[in-house]
Amino acid sequence: MTKSIPRIGSRRGGRIASRKNARRIPKGVIHVQASFNNTIVTVTDVTGRVVSWSSAGTCGFRGTRRGTPFAAQTAAANAIRTVIDQGMQRAEVMIKGPGLGRDAALRAIRRSGILLSFVRDVTPMPHNGCRPPKKRRV
């Protein structure tokens, strides 16, 4: 009878959770991009590496419902839920875009319990750059 050879690369004694979740992030930056059609919430650490993200589309909203304030609130809550588990306590918020979800996303971030050091509007404003598209005639 032969002896069984122990497998070196077996996962029996190893950890099952991914290494990404084990990272502790005490401070981060929450980027909210609110367009008229969708709202994207991205959470990064202070160096700029993406930790978590969510959008109204990934939360299950389709079509015109993606641009609603409720969809933005849901997207912000989804993105923040994962980083709170990783130990985030303080954050800075950068809001970009003219969409309806700006205020709703900020409200959801405030309700989450993360201390906000500042909220900054980083919407790009042209200094009379490109010619805008013609007005719609409906």
Swiss-Prot record:
Stretch list, region Disordered: 1-21
GO terms (BP aspect): translation
UniProt subcellular location: Plastid, Chloroplast
Keywords tagged on the record: Chloroplast, Plastid, Ribonucleoprotein, Ribosomal protein, RNA-binding, rRNA-binding
Coiled-coil residue spans: none
GO CC annotation, single: ribonucleoprotein complex
Matching Gene3D superfamilies: Ribosomal protein S11
Composition bias type Basic residues, residue spans: 9-21
Record's keyword annotation contains Secreted: no
Stored PROSITE patterns: RIBOSOMAL_S11 (PS00054)
One GO MF term attached to the UniProt entry: rRNA binding
SUPFAM superfamilies referenced in this protein's UniProt entry, alphabetically: Translational machinery components (SSF53137)
Quaternary context: Part of the 30S ribosomal subunit.
Entry similarity comment: Belongs to the universal ribosomal protein uS11 family.
HAMAP family recorded: Ribosomal_uS11 (MF_01310)
Name under which the protein is recorded: Small ribosomal subunit protein uS11c
Gene this protein is translated from: rps11
